[in-house]
Amino acid sequence: MTPASRPDWCLILLFLAVLRGESRYIQMREAAEDALFLLNSDFKRELSEGQIYRRSLRCIDMLSIEGQFTFQADRPQLHCALFLIGEPEEFIIIEYNFVNIDCIGGDILKVFDGWIIKGEKFPSSLDHPLSTMERYTDICEDGDVGSITRSSQNVAMIFFRVQQPGHGFTLTIRKIPNLFPCNVISQSMNGRFTMITPHQHRNCSFSIIYPVVIKIFDLTLGHFNELQLKKPPPKGCGDAGDFVELLGGAGLDPSKMFPLADLCHSFHGSAQMKIGCDNTVVRMVSSGNFINRVTFEYNQLDRQLEKKQGNSVEEACFPSD
């Protein structure tokens, strides 16, 4: 990871730490302008049935709960971003209740279907049905007050620039069920997930933004049987139309990550791998000819213990000492 992109990545990790509920209140300097975030699960449960949660937005912010959110500039804000994340089985709905920005004067309010940081996208261009430009919704050009945008996965992002103090906007964020989640960023460093593609020709990536131990318990691809590590020269699964691969890297975009293992054969049992990368991705490629299914469990990896244990692949992301 480049030094320029490291602060952005650390900010994402800090946001996700808050969402996990490690701290009920956390104060972020500079980037979040000393914002206090109340985003953990205990706070969600405190909201009574039917009550709408409301709060102000900061220039750099992140949301994991439903509610109505307002940004009002107290000074020119030129480079702002709002990260939205839901549970793996959720789509995000964004409704524009009130918009008071100067589009002609250079203000911006754009929604991106996914996350994008320093040009790296999730889902990657290989895993999303739309082109990069089609994934943007420009409220200044395409949207009206009352219009609605829906994400294609459990994450979305809003970019905005508001130059005039007192100007801003109000959004309502809702979640709706996604019966067959495809591309996912996990809020947690620990969990279990089953990815299913029912006769659909698409690629799906599950991203875990932590070093983790991955355990794959079950894989059904409609053919064969084996797990093979990618060691040069790899045989790989390139000729298979249906396979699962494990990726690791230091950025957001799965297409720019290291291929660590191919799984192109069905198996039932348990296969484990330790991945010492900042970001770990389980990616399923499906031809649409089968009902493909993979179940896996992930837990945060202790970097002090990862060397010389099992099938550690730490060297794929961190040079050896």
Curated annotation (Swiss-Prot):
Coiled coil: none annotated. It is found in: Secreted. GO terms for biological process: hormone-mediated signaling pathway; negative regulation of corticotropin secretion. Keywords: Disulfide bond, Glycoprotein, Secreted, Signal. The keyword Secreted applies. Transmembrane segments: none annotated. GO terms for molecular function: corticotropin-releasing hormone binding. Its main location: secreted. GO terms for cellular component: extracellular space. Binds CRF and inactivates it. May prevent inappropriate pituitary-adrenal stimulation in pregnancy. This is Corticotropin-releasing factor-binding protein. It comes from Xenopus laevis (African clawed frog). The gene is crhbp.
